[in-house]
């Protein structure tokens, strides 16, 4: 009665335990994640615990995370309890690897910790991060991924990381850091089964997944039913392994939506159960003692029976006791192979078996047989007999069998392969109940058929032993049948159906036709009979007389069809393909003349060759590829025409660029047709590329490039700081950008007043912090050192600043070279520098910084290309670059003859260079006048950044317009720009108001790229670049903030700047000033000022001392904009396609806002106008 109560109490423990739990000591992860049968991708199964479902997940992108409220309570419990326990019932797919639990965030790809069951390695891995460092701890030989249900307990408490499977400790390890003290909940998510990547999701079934916060692992395992070695009573119960098997399985009350409590099952108190266990322990000891005493008594009885000749019940019965067994009167048994014994009146009488004399010269002794035997001729080839099997009955009469084998391919093999004999292991006691037992199977019968597939049968009897005293009969069948395969049966052949009659051999005067059949339905097999009859049959056909044939004289042109009539007349059909005529007389057809576009045409002669008959095309011209059709007749010429396409090694993968380089197709007119540029993160000549850590276009190590191709193949002299110009004044191998003393004069650059000129004495007469040896005005204070005419004499002390031989006081354009001093509007400002040359405006004010004075600026621009209508050379067609190669006042975009050579653009082989003769020596459809230099600017197309605009040939920001976006007030100073690398690198050194350094080159479609680097850790604000600049009120800007921050001036509008890359379009109604300033700082839209087109949702800010590479693609015609930002070789931010047609092009520039020491290096712009 005690055992059922004990089992009932242990079964009821999980429910009682769940009810006793504090609401923050156990969390049902499925419940607080809202995972149920309605969850997409979650499939329900039956697990070890029938009261709750088990789940398998197949769509991990739909798995919901733990609710934010419960996640906060969980992390607080982890800190309070110094860790946690994870319990679950799991059935993991064999040799799979998957995540059990993970805490992801705050970033989209960052994980604070995760627990992974690694099947291939047979480990349970704990991965966590502390202070940006990853820690991985693996428990080995855990045996979880074997497709078997396991009840696991994972302990992560204090400095311990352990795994228990059931009640057994599998492995344990010490934690390096108590990571659970540093977990963050804001913007974090906790997932069950969801891995960081697709291949690390958990594959298998999970049930009862809980996070538990107990005081110790012993308490938790004890509540799960595991016995601890703490006393004799516990040992007494656990030793009896047959009494009770506990399957550790915890069912806990989840913390989440309320569920109905399971009813109480156990009505006994813990004291009553403890008393039962103590009573059972005592009973166990008593039973063991009784069992030992019974064994001793049995041994004594055995000894007494041997002394008195049998047990008391058999003393008056005639029987014998031999070798511990009873034998009935006259019962005979075999003691060994040559001795037989018989029971005679309580006595055992034994005698030797006598053997007859052998009848052969070479008798054969068989093991287990007393007498020798002779091998008969028919038994040649047989193997020796095998050992006899054990007796089929444990008492009474049974049978034994043995077998042998024979090679039937070379022997007759007469005689049986199996022998059976009777055996007896003692008389059965008929006074006891006995179940029946099967005898050995009989040999298989012969096959039921002589050919084909039949059956063989064997039987057995339920007599070893026979059931008695109500014993059970034998289970199973006494007959067994299986298929047998005889030799194949013969198949007689049969004919297939007759084939159709063949055509008659003649059309008249009698001919023969025939038909055939085949003996294959079926064909004869296995000795079957062949088909009877013939395989071919013939009969006469077309017996009528033949008419007179007028075509026998071949009156028609060869190839034309001739038709004959019964009266002897005839007619000719049409001429064959490639000929013209009436069928009797035909002449060659010139397909080339009729179908003029059958072959590819160039500026030279037609490439079609007429033949008799037919035509063919010449091969495609050099640097083209395509087909070379040929044929006969107009239909062929109109159907298949020659198509020759320009060769494109980049598309055909026939280029020789490096695997880390991009192949750029220049056109089939260029020689070479492509160029190679190393990808971001690499540098070199494109044929060879090496790693480039600072993204300035120079490799970390010297590269072995092609002969004389040293540019971008020499080792970077500042490998960790962008310096695309590689300036090295003192030639010491260390670039000026990272050299503390550029001129080697012993004075560090920070203190040197002539950083690039040896002057250890540091004389500075005018106290402008520029040493006398390098001061272009040593006696006049001019720290800016501006020298407009680049003659070595600064503007501050020059009498002719622009070098036009007109002194400053008489020069109406003192900063612009103008020897003619023309001043059309008479305002004292020369036409060369007058922003309104036809309107009197001596003050030259230009509020919107669009280079057009306010007096003549009407801002009417119908095509939105940045040029007002009365100054636009194509006012109705967007052409921001205003290209006009024939200088006729009409822009190329709306001029049908750009070079004014009398050849329309659509037929001109040099559209931008006048060549009325259209000379093309190599016949490649590119005129000789513009071969390899399409815009005739003396820069080869392969090196020209704008090969179709002679006004722009290379990237150059040496001349730029400084635009101050908040020119009033003293919040900060204006930007200070330092020019390097012939205008391909600019450095902004000041912590300034928002400002732009915008170049003067204008673009429609453009690609703009550069390297971004902040060489300080003192600030965290904005920097970036502008494109489509038309005025200080109208432009696009890409700006990047390091950290999220509210602008310190909250008037006129509140401005919140979020970290990350932003793409904005500025269309300000107020222009420069505090309104535009705050709108630029703000991440979002500000009405009448700025609209945000895209902000990187990852909110990744730039890092100090880290090189980034941006790439802008802008196609104003469609509005396509895309911004890519690389960190090293990897893409950090990608806007994807953004479409906006606010502006149809403009100028390019660089942007800063309150950020100092910003490097813009290796700048590159390329025109993409077609």
From Swiss-Prot:
<feature type="glycosylation site" description="N-linked (GlcNAc...) asparagine">
    <location>
        <position position="936"/>
    </location>
</feature>
<feature type="disulfide bond">
    <location>
        <begin position="451"/>
        <end position="489"/>
    </location>
</feature>
<feature type="disulfide bond">
    <location>
        <begin position="946"/>
        <end position="1167"/>
    </location>
</feature>
<feature type="region of interest" description="Disordered">
    <location>
        <begin position="841"/>
        <end position="944"/>
    </location>
</feature>
<feature type="disulfide bond">
    <location>
        <begin position="391"/>
        <end position="423"/>
    </location>
</feature>
<dbReference type="GO" id="GO:0005509">
    <property type="term" value="F:calcium ion binding"/>
</dbReference>
<feature type="disulfide bond">
    <location>
        <begin position="556"/>
        <end position="572"/>
    </location>
</feature>
<feature type="disulfide bond">
    <location>
        <begin position="592"/>
        <end position="608"/>
    </location>
</feature>
<feature type="domain" description="TSP type-1 3">
    <location>
        <begin position="492"/>
        <end position="547"/>
    </location>
</feature>
<dbReference type="InterPro" id="IPR017897">
    <property type="entry name" value="Thrombospondin_3_rpt"/>
</dbReference>
<feature type="signal peptide">
    <location>
        <begin position="1"/>
        <end position="18"/>
    </location>
</feature>
<keyword id="KW-1015">Disulfide bond</keyword>
<dbReference type="InterPro" id="IPR001881">
    <property type="entry name" value="EGF-like_Ca-bd_dom"/>
</dbReference>
<feature type="domain" description="TSP type-1 1">
    <location>
        <begin position="379"/>
        <end position="429"/>
    </location>
</feature>
<feature type="disulfide bond">
    <location>
        <begin position="678"/>
        <end position="689"/>
    </location>
</feature>
<feature type="disulfide bond">
    <location>
        <begin position="462"/>
        <end position="474"/>
    </location>
</feature>
<keyword id="KW-0245">EGF-like domain</keyword>
<feature type="domain" description="TSP type-1 2">
    <location>
        <begin position="435"/>
        <end position="490"/>
    </location>
</feature>
<feature type="disulfide bond">
    <location>
        <begin position="657"/>
        <end position="676"/>
    </location>
</feature>
<feature type="compositionally biased region" description="Acidic residues">
    <location>
        <begin position="894"/>
        <end position="903"/>
    </location>
</feature>
<comment type="similarity">
    <text>Belongs to the thrombospondin family.</text>
</comment>
<feature type="disulfide bond">
    <location>
        <begin position="874"/>
        <end position="894"/>
    </location>
</feature>
<feature type="disulfide bond">
    <location>
        <begin position="447"/>
        <end position="484"/>
    </location>
</feature>
<feature type="glycosylation site" description="N-linked (GlcNAc...) asparagine">
    <location>
        <position position="708"/>
    </location>
</feature>
<feature type="repeat" description="TSP type-3 2">
    <location>
        <begin position="727"/>
        <end position="762"/>
    </location>
</feature>
<feature type="repeat" description="TSP type-3 4">
    <location>
        <begin position="786"/>
        <end position="821"/>
    </location>
</feature>
<protein>
    <recommendedName>
        <fullName>Thrombospondin-2</fullName>
    </recommendedName>
</protein>
<feature type="domain" description="Laminin G-like">
    <location>
        <begin position="19"/>
        <end position="215"/>
    </location>
</feature>
<feature type="repeat" description="TSP type-3 5">
    <location>
        <begin position="822"/>
        <end position="844"/>
    </location>
</feature>
<keyword id="KW-0106">Calcium</keyword>
<dbReference type="InterPro" id="IPR008859">
    <property type="entry name" value="Thrombospondin_C"/>
</dbReference>
<feature type="repeat" description="TSP type-3 7">
    <location>
        <begin position="883"/>
        <end position="918"/>
    </location>
</feature>
<feature type="disulfide bond">
    <location>
        <begin position="705"/>
        <end position="713"/>
    </location>
</feature>
<dbReference type="GO" id="GO:0007155">
    <property type="term" value="P:cell adhesion"/>
</dbReference>
<feature type="disulfide bond">
    <location>
        <begin position="508"/>
        <end position="546"/>
    </location>
</feature>
<dbReference type="Pfam" id="PF12947">
    <property type="entry name" value="EGF_3"/>
</dbReference>
<dbReference type="GO" id="GO:0008201">
    <property type="term" value="F:heparin binding"/>
</dbReference>
<keyword id="KW-0358">Heparin-binding</keyword>
<keyword id="KW-0130">Cell adhesion</keyword>
<keyword id="KW-0325">Glycoprotein</keyword>
<feature type="disulfide bond">
    <location>
        <begin position="575"/>
        <end position="586"/>
    </location>
</feature>
<dbReference type="InterPro" id="IPR013320">
    <property type="entry name" value="ConA-like_dom_sf"/>
</dbReference>
